[in-house]
């Protein structure tokens, strides 16, 4: 069993570069199946989710070369075969294969997706959109069968009942090679959607409106190869900004797009966090007094659900009482009992997280229950006095590239142990 050991209380300083966006690349890689030639992605993060996606692509017949942060995929050999359940079950973003396989073959046999357990994240919105485009859905054991019965998937006018990043991207990808025009209303607006649309348009797609709540896709017959730069990971950036504010004495976070983090930075400024925003970087000063605030997550451009857990250890250093309300994923509270083990004055009341600061954290044995909860525990361990041992770290490695090396370079006493 692998675990992370942190000897906390050491102030961090220096510079850390943000990697490419996990939430983009897990959609970009499956979308490449639609191409008729080689596609190259630059800025690909070294995370286990990428490794899993590469393995799936190779099992399906793609030729893949991955060196440094550059990923080259030739999808011409991809075959219409049932997708491997084991890999699919461990990877939530595997549902992005639905849209690309339907777009290329008009059918797909896939296992249901896995990933972090954050409560209801139904794929009903995806399936409703596919059905509007002529897809029939059936189930056989652990597999889901999607088929157009030999017909070409067709365009449709689709209204998303709930704002959903995954369903928006999946529908957009499926519509790229569909016959006719597709309109997605109440579409999600996240930067990662724009990133996927940019890749597809560079391949020859006709997508307009990505980043707004109405996206229009005019189907095309062929998509050529291209080269694409993955956008910076705004969630990783926010995690390091919060971490730097909590235990830093001057940390510069580079490869940051401020416009992707405006709501997050506004809440930090409300707390009293002192920082300087540069063209593609943010410098976080050593903090003095911070005040407690209320956080309420909402779809982009609101406060990202993925950032409420990584921010929690910093909130615990603030003076006063505050609350965290996650309107996106109701079960995103699993970090709370682990932080309580470390001495945090924090609890869940009526589905809301309530905290009282400042809390003095001490090292403890804790368990990462999901990706962003794991990030919260890493920050808490860096703040805490004494030794913190984090288990179940596979969740953390799913989404944070080179996290041990990056934190070590900032002066953290942190190591990954293989038991």
Curated annotation (Swiss-Prot):
Task: Cite the binding residues for phosphoenolpyruvate.
Answer: 22-23
What is the protein's species of origin?
A: Streptococcus pyogenes serotype M1
Protein name stated in the entry: UDP-N-acetylglucosamine 1-carboxyvinyltransferase 2
Write down the EC number: 2.5.1.7
Q: Which reaction does it catalyse?
A: phosphoenolpyruvate + UDP-N-acetyl-alpha-D-glucosamine = UDP-N-acetyl-3-O-(1-carboxyvinyl)-alpha-D-glucosamine + phosphate
Which pathway does it take part in?
Cell wall biogenesis; peptidoglycan biosynthesis
Q: What gene does this protein come from?
A: murA2
Cellular compartments annotated:
Cytoplasm
Q: What family does the database annotate?
A: Belongs to the EPSP synthase family. MurA subfamily.
Q: Does the keyword Cell wall biogenesis/degradation apply?
A: yes
Name the active site residues: 116 (proton donor)
Q: What does the entry list under GO cellular component?
A: cytoplasm
- The positions annotated for binding UDP-N-acetyl-alpha-D-glucosamine are 92, 121-125, 306, 328
Keywords of this protein's UniProt record, alphabetized?
A: Cell cycle, Cell division, Cell shape, Cell wall biogenesis/degradation, Cytoplasm, Peptidoglycan synthesis, Pyruvate, Transferase
Q: Mostly located where?
A: cytoplasm
2-(S-cysteinyl)pyruvic acid O-phosphothioketal-modified residues are where? 116
């Amino acid at each position: 069993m692998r675990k992370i050991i942190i000897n906390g209380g050491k102030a961090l300083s220096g510079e850390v570069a943000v990697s490419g966006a996990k939430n983009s690349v897990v959609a970009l890689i499956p979308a490449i199946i639609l191409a008729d030639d080689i596609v190259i992605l630059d800025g690909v993060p070294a995370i286990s989710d990428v490794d899993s996606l590469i393995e799936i692509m190779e099992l399906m017949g793609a030729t893949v070369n991955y060196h440094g942060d550059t990923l080259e995929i030739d999808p011409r050999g991809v075959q219409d075969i049932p997708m491997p359940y084991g890999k699919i079950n461990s990877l939530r973003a595997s549902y992005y294969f639905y849209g690309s396989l339907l777009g290329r073959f008009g059918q797909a046999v896939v296992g249901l997706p896995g990933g972090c357990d954050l409560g209801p994240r139904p794929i009903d919105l995806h399936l409703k959109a596919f059905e509007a485009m002529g897809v029939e859905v059936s189930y056989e054991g652990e597999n889901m069968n999607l088929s157009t019965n030999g017909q070409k998937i067709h365009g449709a006018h689709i209204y998303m009942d709930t704002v959903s990043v995954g369903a928006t991207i999946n529908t957009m990808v499926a519509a790229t090679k569909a016959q006719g025009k597709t309109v997605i209303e109440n579409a999600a607006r996240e930067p990662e959607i724009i990133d996927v649309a940019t890749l597809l348009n560079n391949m020859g797609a006709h997508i307009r409106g990505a980043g707004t709540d109405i996206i229009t896709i005019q189907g095309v017959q062929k998509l050529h190869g291209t080269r694409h730069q993955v956008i910076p990971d705004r969630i990783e950036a926010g995690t390091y900004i919060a971490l730097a504010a909590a235990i830093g004495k001057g940390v510069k976070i580079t490869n940051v797009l401020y416009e992707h983090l405006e709501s997050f930075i506004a809440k930090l400024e409300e707390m009293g966090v002192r920082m300087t925003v540069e063209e593609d970087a943010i410098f976080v000063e050593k903090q003095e007094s911070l005040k407690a605030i209320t956080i309420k997550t909402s779809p982009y451009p609101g406060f990202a659900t993925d950032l409420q857990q990584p921010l929690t250890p910093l909130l615990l250093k603030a003076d006063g009482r505050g609350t965290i309300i996650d309107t996106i994923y109701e079960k995103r509270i699993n970090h709370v009992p682990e932080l309580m083990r470390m001495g945090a004055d924090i609890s869940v009341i009526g589905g809301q997280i309530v905290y009282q600061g400042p809390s003095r954290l001490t090292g403890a044995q804790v368990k990462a229950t999901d990706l962003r909860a794991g990030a919260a525990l890493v920050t808490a361990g860096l703040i805490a006095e004494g030794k913190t041992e984090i288990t179940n770290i596979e969740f953390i490695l799913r989404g944070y590239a080179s996290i041990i090396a990056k934190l070590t370079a900032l002066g953290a006493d942190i190591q990954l142990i293989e038991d």
